[in-house]
Amino acid sequence: MDFERLDLLAQKHMKYRKSHKEREMGAAYFHCARVANSVVVLRKKLFPQCSEWDDVLRCAGLFHDIGKGIEPHNHSGAVLVRELLKEELTSEELDKVCVLIEAHTDRRPDTDVHNCLEKLLQDADLLDHFGAQGMWLSCTYYAYEGQQEMLQVPAFYFGEGQEQIKKNRQKLNYDISKEIFDEKIQFELSVAERMRVEGQGDFI
């Protein structure tokens, strides 16, 4: 696969539009670009001998949210990619990429419904919303919503956000993904605690 060409196509279709009203321009592209890398990192940790999966995983990661805004975006994304990449991939590669995109939102970790590649993409996708990116998402969301003070971020993290954290962790397929998730959440909570303290005019 020619990933320079594929990245240019991804930029053309995602970098210069908004997929959510409360997200920054190009958020879908930047998310997909990160997932295209992290899904391969995750594969190396879990299946170090399976490098032959990487091109398909990387391509699916790069385009998995191209359907955002046309819901269900997993289905619309697979349809769009089948047309967009028909001259870029072999028919076998295209079929595999589209199956991965179609499956990426169907998280059922306690079943054998999905194969290893599908589970890898699901986990890489979910993990990208946490850690440093989680703090970025929180701050941009509150800014777009017109919230007025920093204290609302820690109020969420130490309140209703706890249940959301638990639910998202339960969606992960692999134990190592849960370990990565836990580390990311600890970072977010440490930042939220500092925001809570400094938001009241105090010091650590």
Tell me what each language-model feature is.
Residues 1-18:
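Short alpha-helical hairpin
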Residues 5-8, 34, 96, 160:
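Generic alpha-helical secondary structure signal
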Residues 20-49, 63, 89, 110-204:
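Divalent metal-dependent phosphate-bond-processing catalytic cores, especially two-metal-ion Mg2+/Mn2+ enzymes
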Residues 25, 67-71, 87:
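Short gly/ser-rich anion-binding loops that grip negatively charged ligand groups
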Residues 35-38, 73-87:
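An active-site-proximal "capping" alpha-helix that borders the catalytic cofactor pocket
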Residues 52-73, 77, 97-106:
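His-Asp-centered metal-binding catalytic motifs of divalent-metal-dependent phosphohydrolases/nucleases
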Residues 85-86, 105-108:
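Short secondary-structure capping micro-motifs at structural edges
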Residues 90-98:
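Membrane-interface starts of transmembrane alpha-helices
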